[in-house]
Amino acid sequence: MELYAKGEYLLFLNNDTQVQQDWLQPLVDLMEKDATTGMVGSKLVYADGYLQEAGGILWDDASAWNYGNRQNPNDSEFNFVHETDYISGAAIMIRTKLWKEIGGFDERFVPAYCEDSDLAFEVRKHGYKVLYQPKSVVVHFEGISNGTDVTAGQKKYQVENQKKFYEKWKNELEKNHFPNGQDVFLARERGRNKKHILVIDHYVPQYDKDAGSKTTFMYLKMLVSKGYQITFLGDNFYQHEPYTTELQQMGIFVLYGPKYAENWKEWLMENMQYFDIFYLNRPHITIKYIDFIKEHARGKIIYYGHDLHFLRIHREYELDGQKEKLEESEKWKEQELYIMRQADMNYYPSMIEEQAIHEIDSKIPVKAITAYVYEKFMDVVYEPEKREGILFVGGFGHAPNLDAVQWFLDKIYPDVYKNIKADFYIVGSKAPDEITHITTEGVIVKGFVSEEELQQLYNSCKLVVVPLRYGAGVKGKVVEALYYGIPIVTTSVGAEGIKGIEDIAVVEDQEQKLIDAICKVYQNDEKLIEISEKSQLYVREKFSTDAVWDIVKEDFE
């Protein structure tokens, strides 16, 4: 029948299966996402709710495991997309063209058994990947098709065909497969010849809520695109959605749930040997893990501080003179320097932090990296006459953003509105009452918005303001505005760390000069178009995947 199939994909489904809701599209999605994916398969679950398999493992003697058999199908280790040795033929999808190139199931395995394993090996032989898709769930009433007695009926071919399979693929099995039951962590995802990275952060990156999470998410995407196997440990071990599923569909193993929260040390001890790199984020999270990893791991430790907390808080002290801020800054300084001295490499988003660290200790290995990474770029045609309003974007869980908006509303915006009647849109998660309850004429508090709505605002507003009075390092909101080609007016703190930004954005610190600059550029269409064009050229040059990878690849390779 399959010889007459006209569709792009062939689907094989046993007669003893029951498909679950929304089972088909996830299989198609994997095929369409990557042209090198040749075959995909479903998560198979028994009728009693236990897992039958999350992909299959073949050992070097041709014996096989249904990975995860009789485990909880909702456990995190069974819910990420990954390469797999084979997929049980109860529910598999293959490219029709590839199926015909291979010639279908090898007839030496007629009438049953090992034909699915052999097909997976043929798919790889032809240059394609075999993937497991956990979002496609199929109940398999195993045994109904061929029974369970290996001495009778078609079931008797199971042992016989395993011997045939071993003879056909002996060299491949001995070269690329593990002895039975060994190194399951690697075997389950065909990870023998891949580098593995454990990424630790405060929680699964909620990239539409704060700049730090967006940075983490972008770096995860880049590392996956470079072929690394990623395990992600969020310190709260919570399954935030839709963010967790998005990582899992990228092929990232996310640790979540009580099993890992209560036993993370035991899990790390058991699997520490498999990680080539430990990529740790933020000082208050890293301090919990770095000593344990340093003591027991062989892999390299890379620490990304996101910003220098002690520098940011010291600047806040310089602004308000509160003694407790000075004390807090000193505590952060002690902790951050301790972490940096334990790490093999330290990342910060600008030369400002690198210089500040080396002024304290020139021996600390530190590198200025690019905070944001873009795979694709927009071609923005900036039309001032179709835009209106001034936009601020920043999460209010970060104190400098709250201070910036309050200062702008108090000292800058009243005169701006009086002169140009431009509405002020405030976007950011975790907005406190003093922001959400604002009733000032012209001020529109949007609070948290989706990525789609944020993009609409970037495409409809005329100007972005970043009126930060303190902070440290490169500001993600500035980079994002550059990406969307929307002109920026900012302070020197907002512009910090972005080399050459003064040739693109308008930078002013003094209140009246900032007011004048906003009013002037807002009404100058020619200048707005010029800034937009320069912004897009700049971000393409500095923030592409290739540009970022050139900076960090030596640390990961």
Where are these regions (language model features)?
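A short, conserved alpha-helix in the catalytic core of glycosyltransferases
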Residues: 22-28, 83-103, 108-139
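Conserved donor NDP-sugar-binding/catalytic core segment of glycosyltransferases
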Residues: 17-59
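Conserved catalytic-core segment of nucleotide-activated headgroup transferases in glycan assembly
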Residues: 208, 212-217, 221, 232, ...
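Short aromatic/hydrophobic "clamp" motif used to bind/position activated sugar donors
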Residues: 10
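Short hydrophobic beta-strand element within catalytic cores of glycosyltransferases
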Residues: 477-481, 487-491
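Short, flexible, basic/aromatic active-site loop/helix in glycosyltransferases
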Residues: 42, 59-85, 100
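Acidic donor-binding loop of glycosyltransferase active sites
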Residues: 274-276, 344, 459-473, 486
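Conserved acidic donor-binding segment of nucleotide-sugar-dependent glycosyltransferases
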Residues: 504-512, 520-525
